Amino acid sequence: PSQFKFAKDRIENLETVPDIELIDYRLLEGKFDAVVSIEMFEAVGSEYWNSYFQKIQNVLKPNAKAVIQTITMTKDYFEGYDKWPDFIQTYIFPGGELASDQLFIDEANKFDLENIKTTNFAKSYAKTLETWYENFQIAWSDIEEMGFDAKFKRTWDMYLAYCRGGFLNGQLEVSQYLLKVK
């Protein structure tokens, strides 16, 4: 909800105001000029990848495009990851699942969504995670006053460090895929 409000506030004074909705993607109807999905693909989990891409295909107008930003992992790392849940799947995003870059593209292709451009930015995302970690440490006393305990802090310290390490060592990537209907 706070991201929704932020987006609504940002577009408030535009001449042409885009439609921004807070809705379960599976309930979305109509046809759109574009679809933008930011770090949601990995949250739906592999069980729902088909319905995710099917929905994108169904709501795009002819010649429309979709931009999907998602976190992926190397193919080698994925081969073990899909068998043994990691820290993030266990404690942060139960049910979520990352794909490899090629698996993401293959899954999109099943629904006639062709990847026409990929932009990767793992190193800058590692810096973002470092900044989030620093801000979390600075804000901890305020967060603790809201009732969060030391276990919560350790979990988030681990999560932010774990992710940063994955981006720095090349196991994780954050990418934006520009897709069009074939």
How should these model regions be labeled?
Residues 2:
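Conserved Rossmann-like nucleotide-cofactor binding loop
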Residues 7-8:
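Conserved SAM-binding loop
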Residues 16-20, 66:
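Hydrophobic/aromatic anchor residues within beta-strands of the central parallel beta-sheet
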Residues 23-36:
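A short acidic, Gly/Pro-enriched loop at the edge of an enzyme's catalytic core
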Residues 34-48:
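A short SAM/SAH-binding and catalytic strip from SAM-dependent methyltransferases
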Residues 50-65:
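A short glycine-rich, Lys/Arg-flanked "PGG" loop and its adjoining helix->strand segment in the class I
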Residues 69:
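Alpha/beta-hydrolase-fold catalytic nucleophile elbow
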Residues 72-182:
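Substrate-binding/catalytic lobe of Class I Rossmann-like enzymes that use SAM or dcSAM, i.e.
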